[in-house]
Amino acid sequence: MSTLLDVRVAAIRELTPVIREYSFEALASTLPGFSAGSHVQLHLPNGRRNAYSLLSDPADTRQYRIAVRQQDASRGGSRYLHQHLKVGDRLRLSPPANLFPLHGEAQKHILVAAGIGITPFLAYSQELLRRGADFELHYAYRAGSSDAYVDELRQQLGPRLHEYLSGQRRLDLASLLQGRTLGTHVYACGPQSLLLDLQEQASAQGWSPRRVHWEAFAAAEPGQPFRVELARSGQQLEVAADESLLEALEAAGVEVPNLCRGGVCGQCQTPWLKGDVEHRDHFLSANERTSSLMPCVSRGCGSPILLDL
């Protein structure tokens, strides 16, 4: 596992009643460089590990910045940050990792964000402006709650920014994707409904999957409690309704490599031998699901799961 970074909370800024920006500075030495689209995992004092996109300019590593929306159904990540984290507090984070990079072969970049999904595109925009690249940003938001960075983006991007204010203008992905040249790539970050709509519309219009990119860091949805047995050690675990299998394994001292914690990256792929599994990931093929699961999001839905761990 990569060496964690020791950081201090340098600043906290309220962007909307439910979104706050956090700036972190290194306690010693300097922060590692990163590329647009990177994220870090925060290791919180309450035991939670949450992944957040870096919204800072990749050319400036004096600080890392993230933005966090307070989730109504938070299991301790966003709630802890909003209610307990203060300037001067110390935290540990993972080094930056990038599962959502800009693609160098793209001749044009279409960025699509909804709500807090704007965060990776703040770093994207600064990098693309520096390159002199051809791009446009489509941002759907609700006034007063999920409209973080709108004023900043208007000044920075001008006509490259296309706004979709809830109740006034609808983001129509079918129209947005029509008639685009083969060198165009589209990137999306936002709720599950946005990502599914993008995949459906792009497929219907014949877009190559190589030109369609998305990121999802949504926390695992709760479900029914279930039991797990580890085949190699014989250890048995109870996974609570509001706990992921990955969290239960970590609490039991079983470390599983992971990055996104949202069923996207494939890093935590784990073999399973028997039991009933509800797969909720966006990574495994139907064939792979017969023998592997993603403990960050997958759950048991009947008989206990036997993992090859």
From Swiss-Prot:
It is an enzyme of class 1 (oxidoreductase). Residues 2-103 form the FAD-binding FR-type domain. Pfam families: DmmA-like_N (PF22290), Fer2 (PF00111). Residues 226-309 form the 2Fe-2S ferredoxin-type domain. [2Fe-2S] cluster binds at C260, C265, C268, C296. GO terms for molecular function: 2 iron, 2 sulfur cluster binding; metal ion binding; oxidoreductase activity. Coiled coil: none annotated. Its EC number is 1.6.2.-. Its cofactor is [2Fe-2S] cluster; FMN. InterPro entries: 2Fe-2S_ferredoxin-like_sf, 2Fe-2S_ferredoxin-type, 2Fe2S_fd_BS, Beta-grasp_dom_sf, DmmA-like_N, FAD-bd_FR_type, FNR_nucleotide-bd, MRET. Binds 1 2Fe-2S cluster per subunit. CDD domains: fer2, PDR_like. Keywords: 2Fe-2S, Flavoprotein, FMN, Iron, Iron-sulfur, Metal-binding, NADP, Oxidoreductase. The heme-dependent oxidative N-demethylase (HODM) is a heterotetramer composed of a catalytic alpha subunit, a FMN/2Fe-2S-dependent oxidoreductase beta subunit, a gamma subunit with putative aminotransferase activity, and a delta subunit of unknown function. Component of the heme-dependent oxidative N-demethylase (HODM) enzyme, that catalyzes the NADPH-dependent oxidation of dimethylamine (DMA) to methylamine (MA) and formaldehyde. Functions in bacterial methylated amine catabolism, linking alkylamine oxidation to the tetrahydrofolate C1 pool. The beta subunit of HODM binds FMN and a 2Fe-2S cluster, and likely reduces the ferric heme iron of the alpha subunit to ferrous using NADPH. Belongs to the PDR/VanB family. This is Heme-dependent oxidative N-demethylase beta subunit. It comes from Ectopseudomonas mendocina (strain ymp).
